[in-house]
Swiss-Prot record:
Species of provenance: Trichormus variabilis (strain ATCC 29413 / PCC 7937) (Anabaena variabilis)
Pathway: Cofactor biosynthesis; phylloquinone biosynthesis
Uppermost EC category: transferase
GO biological process per UniProt: methylation; phylloquinone biosynthetic process
Name of the gene encoding the protein in the UniProt record: menG
Gene Ontology terms, MF aspect: 2-phytyl-1,4-naphthoquinone methyltransferase activity
Name this polypeptide is given: 2-phytyl-1,4-naphtoquinone methyltransferase
Pfam family membership, one: Ubie_methyltran
Family statement drawn from the similarity comment of this UniProt entry: Belongs to the class I-like SAM-binding methyltransferase superfamily. MenG/UbiE family.
Keywords assigned: Methyltransferase, S-adenosyl-L-methionine, Transferase
Domain of life: Bacteria
Signal peptide: none
Function in brief: Methyltransferase required for the conversion of 2-phytyl-1,4-beta-naphthoquinol to phylloquinol.
Length: 229
């Protein structure tokens, strides 16, 4: 299963950013900045961005921690990491980011290493959510926070119907024109499988986080889980 998901993200790498704009109605940048603020990351911190994709969230984190800080962007898709590296190389001054190809279920870091962490649109796609949160907790310093941003199924039936219409009528046809229809058809079933907010809170507490709060945004079509070690 992990290899299948990795293959999907390797194939969609060239159009990943464009489709994220469509999936979020262009709002993902605002939500990413909100997530970073909630982590409490500050200049000089060492931060982690899991499932970093094309690097957008990691680059934003790097701006927050500045020249005295360090960010590690982790993803298991080599193609997406290459896109992230190219984006970083095009910036001046060069952001302090190390790109790491790894699985979030087995992070190549020491315990208690990071001051803050983010994960954008990744938790829904991991094969073992409790295990990924355990690993995240392991590498965070005591009292450190993480913000996990992702798409969700809204509780409200009207918004749920709109979300499904939007996916079927806008996103998947766009993906088809870009040559990745089959790859983006996975989104709807992944939303159906994804634990709702209160279930995410329960999982986070069960694996040892001292506090966990889930905030629905965009009428429940998006949410951010804030967890503290």
């Amino acid at each position: 299963m992990t290899n299948e998901i990795r293959a999907i993200f390797d194939r969609i790498a060239p159009v990943y950013d464009q489709l994220n704009d469509w999936l979020s109605l262009g709002q993902h940048r605002i939500w990413k900045e909100m997530a970073i603020k909630w982590t409490g990351a500050k200049p000089g911190d060492t931060c982690l961005d899991l499932c970093c994709g094309s690097g957008d969230l990691a680059l934003r984190l790097a701006r927050r921690v500045g020249s005295t800080g360090q960010v590690y962007g982790v993803d298991f898709s080599a193609n997406l990491l290459e896109t992230a590296k190219q984006r970083a190389q095009a910036q001046y001054p060069q952001p302090h980011i190390s790109w790491v190809e790894a699985n979030v279920l087995d992070l190549p870091f020491e315990d208690n290493q990071f001051d803050a962490a983010t994960m954008g649109y990744g938790l829904r796609n991991v094969t073992d959510i409790p295990r990924s949160l355990q690993e995240l907790r392991r590498v965070l310093k005591p009292n450190a926070k993480a913000a996990i941003l992702d798409f969700h199924r809204p509780n409200n039936q009207q918004f749920r119907t709109f979300q499904q219409w939007y996916l079927d009528s806008i996103v998947v046809p766009l993906a088809d024109r870009l040559g990745v229809k089959e790859e983006y058809a996975y989104i709807s079933p992944s939303l159906d499988r994804f634990p709702i907010g209160k279930e995410q809170v329960e999982i986070a507490l069960q694996v040892g986080f001292t506090s966990a709060t889930h905030y629905p945004i965009a009428n429940g079509m998006m949410g951010v889980l804030i967890i503290s070690k």
